[in-house]
Structure formats: structure tokens, C-alpha cells
């Protein structure tokens, strides 16, 4: 797989944009999670209105070779509704926090979706036949008078227009006191974990009424609380290993073979802080917003406010690679603290071969880093460059007084336009980028 673009590498070009163009965006329409399935043929998004929209990849067409990166709506359903916790007098919003696909075992697809409190397992299946010729029912479903039935009929299957159904198969509720921030499916395909601010639970996909608490960092006295869990993920190949990150910038790797309760970690990853750069904001910007294992399982990647770090699982003392995402914002931390942007939770993702990584920034910019060449590129998700197959031009941010023609000044960045959620196709150079209520799909340019 090629690098991130620029130089002798391939270039990224526009494929599609989904969503309305309206200037006034309804809060419910803001995309809150993006996820490709294991084959990359399906792409799911969740939004703040509790809806899940699934897009299906178009089959490659010899007469339209550029359509290989096109996705069209496959299924839309309401996953979660707003609820009210009468015990705590709290509203539970319907926003979808995470979506995770299960590996496909048969013709149907399964995914997990979660809001702050409840996880649901959905089955997405196709129907293109219907049964006709029941003995006790008419074709429109009404019961027939038994005394008028004079012959025995054998029901037959008749073809019908393709219908995609989404049905909830399991509902996993009442296991989290705090807001769920992560779900991760295990490589055993039977269990998954869910994490909130203070606890991580292990579930079996077939059992909804109980889960095992595998991490609990809640202190006896809540005044002694110094950190919270920010993200958690299972290892892609070893079903006994998982990691979780904290608001203190640390990552703990746990092995469930050691003990049932994994409060004692097997490995502890932390980068020593440079005392000379310490400031009031140091702890806030070191909080990890996302952690992802590489597809190979050898590395993991963490995202904090200003950077992306790649860690070798065999080296706990410091990351092996550090990439600055928007270092030019370091001088703006005070104003970012005042407008609460400093608490934004950016996600990150690997490409299929682990050779490149992607994460979001402000002004609808997103960044890509090539791990082999150490080159990086800044691109923009914008309708201005949304002509079919339009090549994305690299963007540059300048901090000084003199600005070149193609540069944007750091003071001109729009902090309301932010790319928090991105996804990379598991095998191809196709990426999905969520920008407020719009989903942009880009692909590498076909020569």
C-alpha cells in the first residue's frame, strides 16, 4: 500500500459527500462515529440523533472505473432513543458513541452500537423472497375462516423487491454507572468489552443479563480520584490482552490470564514529561482521546490533543514514533481552554498495512503521516473541492505574520469545524471523514 500522498506517491481525490449542505446544522444530524466493516464493503455512521446509516460499496464497473470508491445508502435505522433515569434525575441522550462490526459469519451482518448507557447488537439482513399460500391466512395476512378451507396448500416462496432489515438481537443494559466511551469486539468473536470513566466490563455476545467487571479504578473516596479511563481496546489477535488509556496520558496493557480482575496491569506505557515544557495545560493536553492497536498487533497508537504517538508493545518507556498534528496551536491553548475546544476528543486510525496513520484537526483539516518516509500531509474536507475525482490540494497553516498565497493563518482557523472521526478502508486506499453532518469519502487517484 502506498504512502499518504504528495511527491512521487499517489494523490488523494474526492469521491463522494453525504449529508445536507445547510448552514444551520441540526444537532441531531452531527455524525458521532464512523466505522468500516471487516471487508470494507459496508460503512456505518452513527449520529447524535441516535440513528445508524449504513452505506454499501458499489460493485466495480468496467465502464466506470472511478466508481470503485463509491458508497450508497444500504440501510438506515433508529438505534437509540432518548431516555430518562428517574433514579438519578438524568437525561440519557440518544447519541451513538461507538459502532463496532462483528466479523461476518453468514449472509447477515452484525454490529454493536452504544450510547452512554446501553449497548445493542443489530442484525442487518436482506430479504428478496416472501412466502405465499398459507392455509390459515390470506395473502394480505388476515386469518381465514377454518370452515371455508377445503384444500391443503403448500406455501411457496415468491420473489420480491430487495428489502434490507435491521433488527435488534440483544440489548445489553444496566451495567454502567458512568458514560460508555468504548466498545471493542474480541478476536474470539464471542466476547466484547465496554468501558466507561471508571470501569471496564466483559460481555458474552449471547448473554445480556450479566457481565464481568474486569477493571475498576473507582477509589473508595471519590475525592481521591485522579484519573479516568478514556478508551479501551482488545488486541486484534490475542483474546486475553486488552489496553486502556487514561486522562493522565498513560496506557495500561492487561492480560486476563493473570487474574479475573485486571486492576494490576501487565505493562504500563508512559512518556516521561519534559519539565521545561510544563504548563497549566500540560495534564489536559496529555489526556489520551483514542487508542488503537495496529492490524499486525505489534504496535498501538494513541492520540492526545496535539500529537499522535506510536508505541511498540515491547517498549514501555517511550513511544517509538511521535507525530505533531497541530503544534501551531500550542500558543493558543489559553483561548482553546476558554472555548472548551481543548477537551475535544480526536480519534485516529491505521491504514490496512499499518504504514500510514490518519487523524483529524480543526478547520475541517485532517492529517496523514507516512511511517516509512516520515512525510506528512494536511488535507481539507470541503465542498469547494467536491467535483468528482478532484485532486485534494495539500493545505498549510502559517503562524508568522507573512502568509504565502496557498497558506492559511492560524488565527483564521474555524474551531467549530472539526474532524473528530475518521476511518480507513481495511485493504484499499479509501477513507471516510466525518465533518459535522457531512460524510466525505476520498480515494487514491486512478491513473
UniProtKB/Swiss-Prot annotation:
One of its GO terms (molecular function) is enzyme-substrate adaptor activity. Signal peptide: none annotated. GO terms for biological process: cell division; exit from mitosis; mitotic cell cycle; regulation of chromosome segregation. Coiled coil: none annotated. Keywords: Cell cycle, Cell division, Cytoplasm, Mitosis, Repeat, WD repeat. PP2A consists of a common heterodimeric core enzyme, composed of a 36 kDa catalytic subunit (subunit C) and a 65 kDa constant regulatory subunit (PR65 or subunit A), that associates with a variety of regulatory subunits. Proteins that associate with the core dimer include three families of regulatory subunits B (the R2/B/PR55/B55, R3/B''/PR72/PR130/PR59 and R5/B'/B56 families), the 48 kDa variable regulatory subunit, viral proteins, and cell signaling molecules. Interacts with ensa (when phosphorylated at 'Ser-67') and arpp19 (when phosphorylated at 'Ser-67'), leading to inhibit PP2A activity. PANTHER family: PROTEIN PHOSPHATASE PP2A REGULATORY SUBUNIT B. Belongs to the phosphatase 2A regulatory subunit B family. Substrate-recognition subunit of protein phosphatase 2A (PP2A) that plays a key role in cell cycle by controlling mitosis entry and exit. The activity of PP2A complexes containing ppp2r2d (PR55-delta) fluctuate during the cell cycle: the activity is high in interphase and low in mitosis. During mitosis, activity of PP2A is inhibited via interaction with phosphorylated ensa and arpp19 inhibitors. PP2A complexes containing ppp2r2d (PR55-delta) also regulate the activity of TGF-beta/Activin/Nodal signaling by restricting receptor activity. This is Serine/threonine-protein phosphatase 2A 55 kDa regulatory subunit B delta isoform. It comes from Xenopus tropicalis. The gene is ppp2r2d.
